[in-house]
Amino acid sequence: MSQEVVLILFQVVVLVFAFSVHESAHAYTAMRLGDPTAYMLGRVTLNPIKHLDLFGSVLLPLIGLFTGGWLIGWAKPCPITPRNFRDIRRGELLTALAGPASNLAMAGVALLLLMVLKHLVPGGYVSILAAMATADHVALDLGALRLFPIAMLLYYGILINLLLFVFNLVPLPPLDGSMILSQFLPPQIDQAYRRIGLWGFLLFFILGGRILGIFYDPLLGAFNHALATL
C-alpha cells in the first residue's frame, strides 16, 4: 500500500469520527435544552452511519484528497425544532455552538495525548516527527516506527478538528456560524441574511479554497513548528 493511500485512510478515519462527534454534540445539546427531535431520530450517537452525508461526508472529501485540494465537507444537518426549546434563542445559540466546540475539544484532547506520547513514551518524539514529515509528503521508511500510526492519528486529530472548528464558524448558511450570528440580528435583517447567505456560501466554497490556500502552507508550517517545540 502506497504512502499516499495510507495518508488518505488516516485522514478519512479522523474526518468521519470528527463529523460524528460534531453532529452528536448538536443533538445532545438540543436534547438537554428541551428539543428531543434529533434524539428521537437516533442522532445522539457516535455511529457515523447516522450522521454521514454521501456527498458532503464521503465523495467531497475524497475528491479533495485525491486532487490535492482541501479536506473539507459536512455531515447531515442535525434536525431541531426551535419551538421545543425552553428558551428558543438560547437553545438555538448553544446548539449551534456545541458542534464547533466539540471539534475544538477534540483537538485539545489530541494535543494533550500527543504531548504525552512525545515526552513520556520512548520513541514517541521520533514518531511525531515522522508523522509531520509524512503529512508533508516526505517519503520515509516507517516500518520500524511502531508508534507511527498513533502519532499520525493524533496529528490529524488536531489538524482536521481545528480546520472544522474554523470552517464551521464561517457565518454563511448552512454553517453553524450563520446560526450563531443570526441570534444577534434584528428579524428583518436576519431573514434577508438567510436568503442571500446560501449564495454567499456557494461563492465561498468555489473561491474560498484558492484564497485560503495562500495562507494554508505558512500556517501549516507554523503549526508543525509549534508541535515540534512544545
List each language-model region with its residue ranges.
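Hydrophobic transmembrane alpha-helices and their immediate loop junctions
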Residues: 1-230
